[in-house]
């Protein structure tokens, strides 16, 4: 089905009869609907995202502004149609493809320590977003949403304050700013891996109910997709593929339309830059000390998002949304997860199975004083992370360390936050250095 993430995306049908619309001119970008910001999970799990919930509207508006900017500058491989323009979408959309941003993490960590007799408050904000391109089709009277391309975005920021702790308003500003920065710095580069192209065929046989279309090859096509019938280079109707052969397809035609042999048809293909699809499917915490500091159900989704983000930076890697966290249903042919829209409605999205499932294991953490004198203590921190990719027969343990010099009786720190920050750095190292 979608194992190679090569999905021919077929244009939406105009109701027949209607005025013919011009075929897309050479060089003109295809249209994709931008459907806004979703939340990973369902109505029961919304409460796990307190920072997002109190910033839902502000975050949505800020990300929308950024998406409009890159769209207006022509930096994307397609033209975005925004949700406020849905009437225009119905008339102009060339395919069933949509783009959405999904919030998957909104973590805030804080620690206080003393430096030269002054209390310092450190705040860490971790924003996790996954961008998804998905195809929507009507199957048995219901919309079926299938993710065909995705990539993570991570906003990770630290802030140091004096004796006064960071307020909720300041945290909110840091949260939104980090999300916008992550989007601005990555969206164009990562969407550049997507190409939309046209494929053409010719009607060889036709009746009042169906037409047989010679497409040369049907590799990658699927039943249920749409094709446009063209006359004099203009769209005049759209039909649905109901049967596929090796080189041809049988297309159901709309009532009142009579295709003729020799008539041209057109479809729009979406292709990702790689057939190598990865997905973090598991994060374990096998270290007892690490488990006391970082419960698996909390650190797992965070580490999965970080690793996925850094792995995406490696050329040619298509990284599916992490299966760690959220609401997932798994089957032999793929997985499905639930998202919540801005109105609180739940939507089900399907995902093809990855070619390379990835497992992570936090195997150890360590912190100890390595040097000491009358004035200072030198503390060493170390974290170990194992990466396993069974389909590649690959397994390797990575480690990272850091040190902190503290003035005795004056400076202090919180061990957990030092190790948390080091784990973030280690996921980057592991993703970038893994021999895959």
What are these regions (language model features)?
Residues 6-17:
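Bacterial N-terminal signal peptides
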Residues 19-25:
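Sec/Tat signal peptide C-region and signal peptidase I cleavage site
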Residues 25-27, 140-209, 214, 244-247, ...:
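C-terminal/domain-edge helix-coil "capping" segments
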Residues 27-105, 141, 230-232, 283-285, ...:
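N-terminal segment of the mature soluble domain
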Residues 100-162, 356-413:
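Amphipathic beta-strand/beta-sheet edge segments enriched in Tyr/Trp
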Residues 215-221, 255-259, 349-351:
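Short, surface-exposed secondary-structure edge patches
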Residues 216-244:
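Ser/Thr/Gly-rich low-complexity blocks that favor extended beta-strand/coil architectures
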């Amino acid at each position: 089905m979608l194992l190679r993430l090569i999905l021919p995306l077929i244009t939406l049908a105009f109701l027949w009869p209607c005025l013919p619309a011009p075929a897309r001119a050479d060089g003109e970008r295809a249209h994709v609907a931008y459907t806004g910001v979703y939340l990973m999970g369902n109505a029961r799990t919304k409460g796990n995202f307190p920072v997002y919930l109190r910033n839902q509207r502000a975050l949505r508006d800020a990300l929308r502004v950024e998406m409009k900017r890159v769209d207006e500058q022509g930096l994307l491989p397609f033209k975005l149609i925004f949700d406020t323009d849905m009437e225009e979408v119905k008339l102009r959309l060339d395919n069933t493809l949509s783009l959405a941003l999904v919030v998957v993490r909104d973590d805030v960590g804080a620690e206080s320590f003393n430096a030269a007799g002054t209390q310092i408050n450190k705040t860490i904000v971790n924003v996790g977003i996954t961008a998804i391109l998905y195809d929507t089709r009507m199957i048995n009277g219901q919309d079926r949403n299938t993710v065909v391309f995705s990539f993570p975005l991570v906003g990770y920021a630290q802030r140091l304050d004096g004796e006064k702790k960071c307020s909720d308003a300041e945290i909110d500003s840091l949260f939104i700013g980090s999300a916008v920065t992550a989007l601005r710095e990555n969206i164009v580069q990562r969407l550049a891996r997507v190409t939309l192209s046209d494929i053409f065929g010719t009607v060889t046989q036709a009746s009042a109910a169906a037409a047989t279309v010679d497409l040369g090859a049907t590799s990658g096509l699927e039943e249920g997709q749409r094709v446009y019938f063209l006359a004099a280079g203009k769209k005049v109707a759209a039909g649905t593929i109901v049967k596929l052969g090796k080189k041809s397809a049988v297309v159901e035609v709309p009532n009142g339309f009579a295709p003729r042999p020799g008539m041209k048809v057109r479809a729009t293909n979406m292709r990702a830059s790689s057939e190598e699809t990865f997905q973090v499917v598991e994060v374990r915490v096998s270290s007892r000390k690490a488990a006391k500091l970082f419960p698996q159900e909390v650190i797992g989704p965070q580490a999965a998002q970080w690793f996925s983000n850094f792995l995406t930076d490696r050329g040619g890697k298509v990284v599916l949304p992490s299966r760690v966290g959220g609401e997932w249903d798994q089957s032999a042919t793929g997985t499905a997860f639930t998202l919540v829209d801005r109105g609180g409605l739940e939507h089900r999205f399907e995902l093809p199975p990855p070619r390379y499932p990835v497992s992570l294991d936090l195997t150890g953490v360590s912190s100890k004083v390595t040097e000491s004198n009358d004035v200072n203590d030198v503390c060493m921190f170390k974290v170990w992370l194992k990466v396993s990719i069974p389909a590649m027969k690959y397994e390797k343990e990575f480690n990272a360390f850091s040190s902190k010099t503290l003035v005795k009786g004056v400076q202090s720190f919180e061990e957990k936050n030092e190790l948390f920050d080091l784990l973030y750095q280690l996921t980057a190292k592991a993703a970038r250095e893994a021999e895959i």
